[in-house]
């Protein structure tokens, strides 16, 4: 896994923060923005989109991933996530379990990076494996197809 340049980290944080204004959160007022860096250097963005029925709500991370996948892109390097009540960033916002599972579907847990940020000076970088040490993904089903 190559190191991520500070300038790219800053760009991903800025891009994720810019998504907060698009967040549709009339129920929780908890706004989340995400920026997804592909292996070829493209950046896809996402925000959370709530629904009165709650279950159809879509998180920022999945919005960004699904946007990329819907355009034929399936190789990802890093995602940056920011979030907070009313869009005020005071602590890290980690991906929910559903988002982690979607990441397991499309990302290498050993190398895919997750940046949790408050601003360009306050952030931590994890791998997907850090957040899903015993994650279930496509690799688990390779041998089960023979059954």
At which residue positions do the language-model features occur?
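Short, basic/aromatic recognition patches
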Residues: 10-25
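Small-residue (primarily alanine) positions within well-ordered alpha-helices
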Residues: 16, 34-35, 64, 68
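Short beta-strand scaffold segments in enzyme catalytic cores
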Residues: 29-37
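Short glycine/proline-enriched turns and hinge-like loops at secondary-structure junctions
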Residues: 28-29, 58
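Feature of Fe-S/electron-transfer and energy-metabolism proteins
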Residues: 3, 7, 11, 122, ...
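Short beta-strand-to-turn element immediately C-terminal to the catalytic PLP-Schiff-base lysine
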Residues: 37-38, 117
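Zn2+-dependent cytidine deaminase-like catalytic core
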Residues: 45-140
């Amino acid at each position: 896994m190559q190191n991520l340049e500070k300038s790219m980290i800053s760009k991903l944080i800025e891009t994720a923060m810019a998504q907060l204004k698009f967040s549709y959160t009339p129920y929780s007022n908890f706004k989340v923005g995400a920026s997804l860096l592909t292996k070829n250097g493209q950046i896809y963005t996402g925000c959370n989109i709530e629904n009165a029925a709650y279950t159809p709500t879509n998180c920022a991370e999945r919005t960004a991933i699904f946007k990329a996948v819907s355009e034929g892109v399936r190789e990802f390097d890093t995602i940056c996530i920011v979030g907070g009540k009313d869009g005020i960033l005071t602590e890290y916002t980690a991906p929910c379990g559903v988002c982690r599972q979607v990441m397991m579907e499309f990302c290498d847990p050993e190398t895919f990076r997750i940046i949790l940020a408050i601003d360009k000076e306050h952030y931590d970088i994890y791998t997907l494996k850090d957040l899903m040490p015993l994650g279930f993904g496509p690799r688990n089903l390779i041998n089960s197809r023979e059954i």
